[in-house]
Structure formats: structure tokens, C-alpha cells
């Protein structure tokens, strides 16, 4: 750590949060989890272990739909775990999918697989007694869930661009390298869940009981990383703590990355010390310094991030405390090189290309729309069986996108008809509106303990109502990026939507508008604590104006800004909560 400890380290004068004690006492994340696994009196974990399992990629949850009923019967809530796999760039092999599907059907309460907007899959409803078998299964097929939650670098995103196959492969390889480089070295995960068996992807990193990058108390808070390939911003690159924007040379080869830091979308209702934020640029690094830059940012956050107040512990708050120049200087000191000036780039869109596209390598790629990422079997749509049948015959790979969809990638010309026939048979190819195609939600109720309102379960009908509004005003073929999140923690990325709903209470939401299509602008609160029907009515009025008053090809989010319906968020740490404080030239 630098000797200059004043700027950015004022939090050290306050008591540390209890999470810091927990990590210190955890014996490198082992805790007493093994003892809890033997305790059949409860379906959950006790004491510190409730938090420690998050470092191993799990959260304890319960079915909130039946919580009151079980309370009346004097039973504890129906506890189970969420498991989030580590899957850099979202690439998974068909043979892996077949095993994942089997476990979901046989051992999870909801018999479903949830694709997330962080390019991985989650199990919901895993009973405690099935946790070790689940981790051993993942290990046996070359997967794990290390560091997909808690105070570590989480699953690394990478643009799912099937057309630019060579560039995507180069960027994807760096996403994997970044993920591996920033993993914890502790053997705790292996000792608890795999009984010390060799892990194919991470074993070399976990042999030494030391944490030279993360430190023995790991990071102050969650840490998210993404790799984006312009012009597609499907990973919402401005929404993460650490971001790498791929830059090509004159021959179209990857030559390095622009590095951005300090993005993040979580905040707390009414707490003006919290705010969502788009990332800032540190500059450009050539390929050979990519891992050094990643390590430098992590070490700077490790040493300067707030360990007293977890609500102000993400990278954006560290930058606010240190200033951007101060943060950059510390990162440069850690990696022992200077950033070069930011290279030019442009993002134009962030949605997936639903349907077939052909890559420059002449392979075909089929992007399947999966509403809210939920893969399950319903009588009218047996999607889960459909993906399983695809996995049985597909010779390429699957790619989970940051928009919660699934790409059947690298399909040869002669296999295309068979893949399409299976997808159509099981309802995986369907006609949907542009609005629905670009909509997203978090899981929320009934499993998320933080949920204040519904999200995934209300999204389909809500989008249907908005489709009617767009048809009414003759703009049914247009797209408005719409997202619902059940609380302000930001999992649904609603704060980068043109229309964003943030749960406030059961049946009530805050309506935010004014984000842009490329994901460069935070949306602003427009109406507070209103019902879904009231939101539809508000959007009806706004779309009526947009349909008649917009400029050529003007997006909805840009229109509401230009028309002074809502003020833009220019510098979120200053004006997110109060638009009268907008100072366009403000520099941190």
C-alpha cells in the first residue's frame, strides 16, 4: 500500500464492519461449514457460515410464497440454496449442459435452470444435503462456483459476438485469464465441497495458502468485471467495477484494452450517500499489461476501499474519496506502468441478435430468446427439454448472453436444419416483439430475500401491456429497453434502461426513465411508489408524445431528455438524487 494514507482512507478512523471480522476468522473461507452440513435440524447455515457460503458461490434462501404458512405451522422457513456457477464469458459445452440439466430435474425444488445477465446459470432450491454432490458434479465436468458471490471478483463477462469469431475468441481468452488471475488462492472451496480433489480449472492457483492479490480479508465488497467488444455493449460495460473495452489494430487484431472503473447500479432507497454510476476511463493498456492492470485495480480497491461502511464500499465510492486521478495514480504504481490515452471506440447497441447469424468463419449461430433467462418445462413451452435435446446433438458450444439468452454456437451448415427443427419443436423459436426481445428482469420473488416487489413473474404480462401501448401509437416495431428489478440492488440493471422499474413494496415500483440504447446513461426517477397499471398509464402518455414529436430514429430515452420531460443524470455522485445540482463540466 502507498504511504499516502490520508486521501481515501478516512474510513479507517471508524470501526470495521463485522464482515471484516468474519473474513479474518474464517480460516481462509472454511469456517465451520462442514459441521453445519452434518446438522439435520435446520435446512440452513448458522452464524458466520450463512455469509461464508457466499464466497463459494451460494446464497441461503427460502420460498417466501409459503413462509407465512410454515410460520403458522411452527416450522422454520423452507430453506435452500442458490448456486451460481463460475462461467467466464458464458461458454458451456453440451456435455456439461446435459449433467447440469439432470441435477436440476432431480435435486432442485423448482426443476429449472436460470440464465443470468452475468452470463452464467443459477440453480434455485438446492437442499443443504445435496450441496456437496452438486459441487462434486460441477468439479467432475470442469466447472466450479468459486467467487461468484461475496467480496471477490465475480463471474467475468465477455461480449457474445458470434460474427466476429476470431476477435471474440481473443477477447474471451482474456476474460478467462482475468477470471483465473483474480481467483482466491485458498483451498477452502476444495476442502469443504470437493474433499481436496483436484480441480481442473483452478488447482494451480489454490495450492498455496496465501492471498497475494485479494489479501487475507479479500475485497471490501463485491467486485464485477466485464470485457466488451465494440460496437456491441451487450455486457453493459459501464455498469461494472472493472471493465475492458477491446481495441483492434489496423489489421483487425486485438491489440489491447481501454480500462474503465467505477461502474455499478446498486443504491438504497432514500440514502443519498448511495448512487448508481457509469464507469470512468483510466486509459489504454496493450495486451501484455492486461492482467497487471486488472491486478492493479483490484489491489487499489483492496487497500483503499471502505471497510467500515459496506454501503459505500464499491469502487465508485473509492474513486469519489480518492479522486479519479488519485485512483489512477495508485493503479499505475501497483502495475508499474502508465496508462496510455484512451483509444477511440463506439457502442451502438446492446441487444442480442435473435435468430440465425453467420460468422466470418462460415459457422452459423442461433440465438434463442429465453424470457428472463428461465429455462423450465411448461405444458405449452417445454424449453428445458428442448435445450436438453439440442445438447444431445449439438457439436459446438452454448453461450449464455448478458441479456439472459442462449446462443447455440458454431453450427455447421449441414447441421443447421436439425438444430432449427428441434428448437421450433420445443418452442425455443418464437415470434416476439422488439420490446419483449430487449426486456430483462431479476429473479426477485419468491426466492430472493432482498426482493421488495415482483420482477420475473410480472415481466411477461407487463411487457404485453406495453406492447399494446406501442401498437396504439403505431410504434409497435420500435424497441424501448425495459427492465424490472425487485429492489434497488441493481441485479436487473434497470438503472441503465430507457424504462426501468425498481421495486419499492409489494405491487409498487419507482419508475425511472432516460437511459439510452447504448447503455451510457443512468436513468432518473420519474414517478415514485406507483402500481404497474399506473406505470402503464404514465408510459402511454410518454409514448404518445414520442411517437409524434420525436426526431428521425430518435430513441425513447433520448427523446425524454431532449424534450425536457426528465433531466439527464450527468454526474451521478452529484446529481442523481437532485437534478438541480447538474454541473455538466464537473470532473471528479
Curated annotation (Swiss-Prot):
Superkingdom classification of source = Bacteria
Q: Does the keyword NADP apply?
A: yes
Q: Name one GO cellular component term.
A: sulfite reductase complex (NADPH)
Molecular function per GO: 4 iron, 4 sulfur cluster binding; heme binding; metal ion binding; NADP binding; sulfite reductase (ferredoxin) activity; sulfite reductase (NADPH) activity
Task: Provide the residue positions that the database annotates as binding siroheme.
Answer: 491
Residues in a coiled coil are none
Task: Kindly tell me the pathway this chain contributes to.
Answer: Sulfur metabolism; hydrogen sulfide biosynthesis; hydrogen sulfide from sulfite (NADPH route): step 1/1
Q: Name one Pfam family in it.
A: NIR_SIR_ferr
EC numbers listed for it are 1.8.1.2
InterPro entries the record matches: CysI, NiRdtase/SiRdtase_haem-b_fer, Nit/Sulf_reduc_fer-like_dom_sf, NO2/SO3_Rdtase_4Fe4S_dom, NO2/SO3_Rdtase_4Fe4S_prot, NO2/SO3_Rdtase_4Fe4S_sf, NO2/SO3_Rdtase_FeS/sirohaem_BS
Cofactor: how and how many bound: Binds 1 siroheme per subunit.
Q: Which UniProt keywords apply?
A: 4Fe-4S, Amino-acid biosynthesis, Cysteine biosynthesis, Heme, Iron, Iron-sulfur, Metal-binding, NADP, Oxidoreductase
For this UniProt entry, which segments traverse the membrane?
none
One GO BP annotation of this record: sulfate assimilation
Task: Report residues binding [4Fe-4S] cluster.
Answer: 442, 448, 487, 491
Q: Which reaction does it catalyse?
A: hydrogen sulfide + 3 NADP(+) + 3 H2O = sulfite + 3 NADPH + 4 H(+)
Cofactors needed by this protein, per the record, are:
siroheme; [4Fe-4S] cluster
Q: Which family does it belong to?
A: Belongs to the nitrite and sulfite reductase 4Fe-4S domain family.
Provide the function of this protein. Component of the sulfite reductase complex that catalyzes the 6-electron reduction of sulfite to sulfide. This is one of several activities required for the biosynthesis of L-cysteine from sulfate.
Q: How does it assemble?
A: Alpha(8)-beta(8). The alpha component is a flavoprotein, the beta component is a hemoprotein.
By what name is this protein known? Sulfite reductase [NADPH] hemoprotein beta-component
Amino acid at each position: 500500500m502507498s504511504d499516502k494514507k490520508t486521501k481515501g482512507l478516512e474510513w479507517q478512523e471508524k470501526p470495521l464492519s463485522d464482515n471484516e471480522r468474519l473474513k479474518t476468522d474464517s480460516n481462509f473461507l472454511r469456517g465451520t461449514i462442514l459441521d453445519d452440513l452434518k446438522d439435520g435440524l435446520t435446512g440452513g447455515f448458522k452464524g458466520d457460515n450463512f455469509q461464508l457460503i457466499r464466497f463459494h458461490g451460494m446464497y441461503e434462501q427460502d420460498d417466501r410464497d409459503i413462509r407465512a404458512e410454515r410460520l403458522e405451522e411452527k416450522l422454520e422457513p423452507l430453506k435452500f440454496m442458490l448456486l451460481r456457477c463460475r462461467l467466464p464469458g458464458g461458454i458451456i459445452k453440451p456435455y456439461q449442459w446435459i449433467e447440469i440439466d439432470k441435477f436440476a430435474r432431480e435435486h432442485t425444488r423448482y426443476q429449472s435452470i436460470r440464465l443470468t445477465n452475468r452470463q452464467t446459470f443459477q440453480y434455485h432450491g438446492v437442499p443443504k444435503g445435496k450441496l456437496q454432490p452438486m459441487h462434486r458434479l460441477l468439479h467432475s465436468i470442469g466447472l466450479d462456483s468459486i467467487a461468484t458471490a461475496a467480496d471477490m471478483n465475480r463471474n467475468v463477462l465477455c461480449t457474445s459476438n458470434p460474427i466476429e469469431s476470431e476477435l471474440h475468441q481473443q477477447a474471451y481468452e482474456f476474460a478467462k485469464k482475468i477470471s483465473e488471475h483474480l481467483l482466491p488462492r485458498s483451498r477452502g472451496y476444495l476442502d469443504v465441497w470437493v474433499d481436496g480433489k483436484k480441480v481442473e480449472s483452478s488447482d494451480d492457483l489454490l495450492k498455496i495458502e496465501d492471498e497475494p492479490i485479494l489479501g487475507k480479508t479479500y475485497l471490501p465488497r463485491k467486485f464485477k468485471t466485464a470485457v466488451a467488444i465494440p460496437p456491441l455493449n451487450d455486457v453493459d460495460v459501464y455498469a461494472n467495477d472493472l471493465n475492458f473495452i477491446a481495441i483492434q489494430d489496423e489489421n483487425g487484431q486485438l491489440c489491447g484494452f481501454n480500462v474503465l472503473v467505477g461502474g455499478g447500479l446498486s443504491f438504497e432507497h432514500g440514502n443519498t450517500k448511495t448512487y448508481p454510476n457509469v464507469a470512468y476511463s483510466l486509459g489504454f493498456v496493450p495486451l501484455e499489461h492486461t492482467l497487471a492492470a486488472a491486478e492493479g485495480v483490484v489491489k487499489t480497491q483492496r487497500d483503499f476501499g471502505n471497510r467500515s461502511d459496506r454501503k459505500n464500499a464499491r469502487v465508485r465510492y473509492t474513486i469519489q474519496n480518492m479522486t479519479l486521478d488519485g485512483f489512477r495514480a495508485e493503479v499505475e504504481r501497483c502495475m508499474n506502468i502508465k496508462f496510455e490515452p484512451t483509444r477511440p471506440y463506439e457502442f451502438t447497441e446492446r441487444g442480442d441478435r435473435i435468430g440465425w447469424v453467420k460468422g466470418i468463419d462460415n459457422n452459423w449461430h442461433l440465438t434463442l430468446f429465453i424470457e428472463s433467462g428461465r429455462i423450465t418445462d411448461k405444458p405449452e413451452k417445454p424449453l428445458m427439454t428442448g435445450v436438453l435435446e439440442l445438447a444431445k446433438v449439438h457439436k459446438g458450444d452454448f453461450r449464455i448472453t448478458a441479456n439472459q439468452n442462449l446462443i447455440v454456437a458454431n453450427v455447421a451448415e449441414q447441421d443447421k436444419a436439425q438444430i432449427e427443427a428441434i428448437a421450433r419443436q420445443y418452442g425455443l423459436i418464437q415470434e416476439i416483439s422488439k420490446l419483449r426481445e430487449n426486456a430483462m428482469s431479476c429473479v426477485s420473488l419468491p426466492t430472493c430475500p432482498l426482493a421488495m416487489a415482483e420482477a420475473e413473474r410480472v415481466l411477461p404480462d407487463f411487457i404485453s401491456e406495453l406492447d399494446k401501448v406501442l401498437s396504439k401509437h403505431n410504434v409497435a416495431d420500435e424497441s424501448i429497453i425495459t427492465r424490472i428489478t425487485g429492489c434497488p440492488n441493481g441485479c436487473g440493471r434497470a438503472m441503465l434502461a430507457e424504462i426501468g422499474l425498481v421495486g419499492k413494496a409489494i405491487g409498487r415500483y419507482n419508475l425511472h426513465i432516460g437511459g439510452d440504447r447504448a447503455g451510457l446513461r443512468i436513468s432518473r426517477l420519474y414517478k415514485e411508489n406507483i402500481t404497474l397499471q399506473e406505470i402503464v398509464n404514465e408510459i402511454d402518455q410518454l409514448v404518445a408524445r414520442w411517437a409524434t414529436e420525436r426526431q428521425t430514429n430518435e430513441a425513447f430515452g433520448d427523446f425524454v431528455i431532449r424534450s425536457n420531460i426528465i433531466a439527464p443524470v450527468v454526474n451521478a455522485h452529484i446529481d442523481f438524487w437532485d437534478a438541480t445540482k447538474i454541473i455538466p463540466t464537473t470532473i471528479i
